[in-house]
Amino acid sequence: MRTVEYAPGRSADVYGTPGPATALLWHGTQTDSRAAVQILAQALADRGLAVIAPDWDSHAPDGGRSDLLASATFAQQQASGAGLVIIGWSLGGVAAAGLTLRASELNVVVTHTVCLSGAFWADDPISGGVVQSGAPAGAVPTPFTLLTGDADDVVPASASIEFAAELRVIGWPAEVIDLPADHGSIAGARYVPDEDRYEAADDPQTRNVVDAVAELILARTGHSGR
């Protein structure tokens, strides 16, 4: 892993060597918490999918939009123009959906989007509004894989189920898969109550969840065995 600047003063961790198989992995609401998803990022890189995991600030005046778009531009450049896999956790999943639906307007090429416990009732940091408002006319549908945790007490599976239904109405393919995970472990993290934050977790149970998530991502995005 190496740390780079994707924009002045803004950091991202790069796992593997970006190229045709590259994912952009956005953490959740917690400001500048790229380290929280390092276990998942490394698991994906170990399987051949390079990962760029940037910091972003959901509490910035623009809701993190400038960070998110700058990181997407950086990832696209690092991938030599190849299409990106976009992975987002919690609010990052909402942002991933928002970027994907408007990718043609934002000059980003997205091949597949994976949302981990996406909090789809929250405002989309990309558009600043409801992500379910739909894609621009003429947008090419991108496949979505929505992963939920059966022990998630923060974001219910119904959020992903309802969002998937709304995607299908506008002709975008969407699959929902429920896993034995909680809100943190689905992204390789644990919640620290005393500090009210998430951090990376490498305990055996979380590792098992991460392995399952990584295998699903590789299988659904067509990068298995690379």
Model-predicted segments: where are they?
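The feature captures the conserved acid-bearing segment of alpha/beta-hydrolase catalytic domains
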Residues: G118-I170
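N-terminal cap/lid segment of alpha/beta-hydrolase-fold proteins
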Residues: M1-P18
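The serine-hydrolase catalytic nucleophile loop
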Residues: Q30-A41, W56, S158
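Primarily recognizes the serine-hydrolase "nucleophile elbow" in alpha/beta-hydrolase
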Residues: T73-A135
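Conserved alpha/beta-hydrolase
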Residues: A45-P61
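C-terminal catalytic histidine-bearing segment of alpha/beta-hydrolase fold enzymes
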Residues: I170-R226
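Short beta-strand element of the alpha/beta-hydrolase
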Residues: P20-G28
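Alpha/beta-hydrolase active-site loop
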Residues: A60-A79
